[in-house]
Amino acid sequence: MRKFLKYQLDVPSINSEDKNRTVVKIAPLEIGFGDTLGNALRRICLSSIPGASMFAVKFGGYSHEFQPYEGVKEDITHIILNLKNLAIKIDELIYSEDYFNNLLIDKWPKMKINFKGPGVITAKDIVCPVGFEIVNQDLYIAEVTKPIDVEIEIFAKTGRGRVDFNTNKDFVSTLHIIATDSNYSPVLHYAYNVEMIKDSKSSMSEILTIDIATNGTISGSEAIAIAAKIMQAHLEPIVNIDKTINEMIIMREREEEEKRQNASISIDDLDLTVRAYNALKQSGINTTAELIELTKSQLEKIKNLGRKSVTEIIQKLTERSLELKKD
């Protein structure tokens, strides 16, 4: 089986202009694999990367989202819309998935806002329980226009994908707690581009460029790595249908590929002197593949090929990571 060439990853350092954006380049890929990988990673990144999200909120003195908030510029609906933009991190070493699955809403760890107006409420005014963190501290939430106390409790948990309002409403049955829809995905944007690149005179490959942006709770490179891990976990049982397949070597190192390509080129491309070139041609040697089947002593016996020409040929082979057979 002809092996696939191992590709290289170019993951740049954090972008100083936008710390939540990452551009990753993957190359060289065989023709067709740019779209295969780019599209598969895209679907997983946008739908299945785990994260944290608000799923309910409680406003002190208010029972539903369609009420105006006295003394606050925004009504409750608009405040909820702003709160849904919170980039929340939850430490899964403290709060596992099972922890939330078995927890009643009245025992839930809550993020709280206790704000004395007037003034502007931002995410930095949120007090988080241990294990919870708000990444986008500058997020605008509301403007309090009067000297009143604003009390808000925010309920969040880990998950993946999107969960609609009705599903969360079934879970939240406590009076005065308002269910919201949830978007757990930390990936805000994913785009990819595939370009053809020339490896040699006759060989083409692809370069896959992924442009990904997150909400800051994880990096773009982390999101891509998690997506690859999810894909790997789904493919592994299929690979294990035949246990012998696990022992197959699918990829080869770049150096091996270069040697393979160099071993099949014409001696016309070695840029030899006329004397050395003519001597090889007259002896029926036309490619490097034929040349490296010779030992040094066999090469020295070729008619009209002197010691200087032999040294020249060996040097040209070395430049292409090739060598003669051992005597």
Swiss-Prot record:
Query: A GO molecular function for this record?
Result: DNA-directed RNA polymerase activity
An annotated GO cellular component:
cytoplasm
Name of the protein this chain belongs to: DNA-directed RNA polymerase subunit alpha
Name the keywords, alphabetized: DNA-directed RNA polymerase, Nucleotidyltransferase, Transcription, Transferase
Write down the InterPro entries for this protein, in alphabetical order. Answer: DNA-dir_RNA_pol_insert (IPR011262), DNA-dir_RNA_pol_RpoA/D/Rpb3 (IPR011263), DNA-dir_RpoA (IPR011773), RBP11-like (IPR036603), RNAP_asu_C (IPR011260), RNApol_insert_sf (IPR036643)
Tell me the enzyme class: transferase
UniProt keyword annotation of Metal-binding present: no
The UniProt annotation puts the region (Alpha C-terminal domain (alpha-CTD)) at 259-327
Give the catalysed reaction(s), semicolon-separated: RNA(n) + a ribonucleoside 5'-triphosphate = RNA(n+1) + diphosphate
Family per similarity comment: Belongs to the RNA polymerase alpha chain family.
Region feature Alpha N-terminal domain (alpha-NTD), mapped onto this chain: 1-242
**EC number of the protein:** 2.7.7.6
Q: Subunit structure of this entry?
A: Homodimer. The RNAP catalytic core consists of 2 alpha, 1 beta, 1 beta' and 1 omega subunit. When a sigma factor is associated with the core the holoenzyme is formed, which can initiate transcription.
Task: Please list the GO biological process terms of this entry.
Answer: DNA-templated transcription
Q: From which residue to which does any coiled coil extend? A: none
**Keyword Transcription annotated:** yes
Lineage, top-rank taxon, reads Bacteria
Q: What is known of its domains?
A: The N-terminal domain is essential for RNAP assembly and basal transcription, whereas the C-terminal domain is involved in interaction with transcriptional regulators and with upstream promoter elements.
NCBIfam families, per the entry: PRK05182.2-5, rpoA
The entry's function note states:
DNA-dependent RNA polymerase catalyzes the transcription of DNA into RNA using the four ribonucleoside triphosphates as substrates.
